[in-house]
Regions:
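Glycine-rich phosphate/adenosyl-contacting loop at the front of the ribokinase-like
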Residues: 1-62, 66-80, 245-246
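A glycine-rich helix N-cap at a beta->alpha junction
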Residues: 78-90
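Conserved beta-alpha-beta core of the PfkB/ribokinase-like small-molecule kinase fold
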Residues: 135-205, 224-227
Length: 272
């Protein structure tokens, strides 16, 4: 039997242009290849977990429009349960405009659209799915009151909660105290703890601060250097594989979705 992961988060239609260099303020550059596809942190993480083999249910909100229908179709093709993807009659499906340079770096602007209307009532409607999951994976592209409702529901039912605190924003301890595992990047870790990353000792201090918040395990992503894994019994850097980047869009999302699947199978955060 597959282990179950519920992802609560965003779905966006990504519109991507590839170009030699990212434009600066007031600058126009000529792009090349253009494509559209599914995206959003929640959707990316759900797909990553499903492709690894987890049974995934995705809770989200899309517009009652063509882009929303296409998104649900894409997710169904990935064998993701879309029963709790709600259609919104007020706002359109979220859209992300992405520019990618020839080094694989990107700049992104997001119009949240229907993602902004995901409500605690939506979360309550999906409570049976959440309570029966092994893992709840959530990000911060949804309204904070819905993030709280999801995390609290999972915690109250003994479900392991993984929070990917992106996009970076300050969070109160009334949310963090219900989180089991947190997966920030350096910017997010610094914002949530007030500790500047300078070396391994500062990473250890950040992990200890998260422990003070009540979080059990910490995964701090370090870009090309890998990630720093912090548990109560061990802390260490897990190095990244040396690969040539093509497009870094969604890389952090895939990283968060993958551990959700592996942890649901009983692996630990120190497993490379």
């Amino acid at each position: 039997m597959k282990n179950k992961v519920v992802v609560v988060g965003s779905y966006n239609t990504d519109m991507t242009i590839k170009t030699k260099k990212l434009p600066g303020p007031g600058e126009t550059v000529i792009g090349g290849y253009f494509s559209t596809g599914g995206g959003g942190k929640g959707a990316n993480q759900a797909i990553a977990a499903a492709r690894i083999g987890a049974e995934v249910c995705f809770v989200a909100r899309v517009g009652n429009d063509v882009l929303g229908s296409e998104g649900i179709k894409r997710l169904n093709e990935e064998h993701i349960n879309t029963k709790y993807i709600y259609r919104d009659n007020e706002l359109p499906t979220g859209v992300a405009f992405i520019v990618v340079d020839d080094k694989g770096e990107n700049s992104i602007v997001v119009a949240s659209g229907a993602n902004a209307n995901l409500s605690p009532t939506d979360i309550e409607s999906a409570s049976d799915e959440i309570s029966s999951a092994d893992i709840l994976l959530i990000q911060l592209e949804s309204p904070i009151e819905s993030v709280y409702a999801s995390i609290k529901s999972a915690h109250d039912n003994g479900v392991t909660v993984i929070l990917n605190p992106a996009p970076a924003q300050e969070l109160d301890n009334h949310i963090l105290k219900y989180v089991d595992i947190i997966t920030p990047n350096i910017v997010e870790a610094e914002m949530l703890t007030g500790i500047k990353v300078t070396d391994v000792n500062s990473l250890q201090s950040i992990v200890n601060r998260f422990f003070d918040y009540g979080i059990n395990d910490v995964i701090i992503t370090l870009g090309s250097k890998g990630y720093f894994a912090g548990a109560h019994d061990a802390m260490k850097i897990i190095p990244a594989l040396n690969v040539a980047p093509i497009d870094t869009t969604g890389a952090g999302d895939v990283f968060s979705g993958s551990p959700a699947a592996f942890l649901s199978e009983g692996m630990t955060i120190e497993t490379p």
